[in-house]
């Protein structure tokens, strides 16, 4: 389940990306994921995720990103949600995998 907040267009795009990601990463379907769209530039990041409960995640994404960057960022953070569900908490391997998969999945999403 995906819940979103923020601008009119971003929640719609977030739903599209999430539905696509369920096909790529079926384990995401076991979690409740909330996506907040907000200004993160002052924090020096464009997105992050945190586990709220065993099967609940909060993903925050910079609201002013260009569409392509928004898609990459949301995919990246959803990969982190799946990694957490699997118990992969080692930061270096998490980031390497998320960066590798974000490009692959973004290309598939655009096709």
Q: Whereabouts are the PLM-identified features?
A:
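Auxiliary, metal-adjacent structural segments of Zn-dependent hydrolase domains
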Residues: 2-64, 107-111
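Hydrophobic (often cysteine-bearing) scaffold residues that line and stabilize catalytic clefts
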Residues: 10-13, 71, 94
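A short glycine/small-residue-enriched secondary-structure motif
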Residues: 53-54, 76-78
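Short pre-active-site segment immediately N-terminal to the catalytic Zn-binding motif
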Residues: 57-74, 88-89
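Catalytic Zn2+-binding segment of zinc metalloproteases
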Residues: 78-93, 97
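Post-HExxH zinc-binding segment in Zn-dependent metallohydrolases
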Residues: 91-111
């Amino acid at each position: 389940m995906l819940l979103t907040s923020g601008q009119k267009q971003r929640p719609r795009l977030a739903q599209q990306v999430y539905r696509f990601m369920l096909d790529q990463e079926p384990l995401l379907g076991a979690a409740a994921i909330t996506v907040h769209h907000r200004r993160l530039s002052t924090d020096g990041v464009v997105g992050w995720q945190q586990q709220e409960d065993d099967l609940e995640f909060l993903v925050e994404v910079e609201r002013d990103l260009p569409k392509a960057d928004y898609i990459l960022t949301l995919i990246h953070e959803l990969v982190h949600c799946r990694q957490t569900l699997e118990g992969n908490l080692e930061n270096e391997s998490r980031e390497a995998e998320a960066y590798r998969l974000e490009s692959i999945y973004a290309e598939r999403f655009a096709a």
